[in-house]
Amino acid sequence: MAQGVVAVERMAGLDVPDLNYVDMPRATYSAPQISSFGLTEQQAKGQGFELKVGRFPFRGNGKALALGDYEGMVKIISDANGGAVLGVHMIGAEVTELLGEASLTRLLKGSTEELAWLVHPHPSLSEAIKEAALAAEDRAIHM
């Protein structure tokens, strides 16, 4: 959809920024769902970043357990120097719905520390993002 909006707005003569395809959210509607944006660990290392990586399995998430659909995980790749979020990768139930929060953190140049401080409803699947951010900071609660 974003590409279409940019194309039409440019045809209308509006000043529109280029799309950032690295940070473009990616969603695969499969069972389980897969969603991601940004760099993978390998890509980030290849670009010379020193990394902090936070992982959190949905097995540790109360909402996923209550739903009986707890396979999968959230993985956050961040710059070890300042914690800038470089990429987020998720596999599990409804993860395509969870990507917006992490993507917004990247757009606003946020860090894993800031993402970790974000308050989430409890219980919710989105708490897995917070937990992965906490894990990147070596402060995971439910691990």
Segments from the language model and where they lie:
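Flexible, glycine-rich terminal cap/loop adjacent to redox cofactors
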Residues: 12-13, 17, 24, 29-143
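Acidic, glycine-rich loop-and-beta core segments that form the ion-binding/anion-interacting portion
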Residues: 1
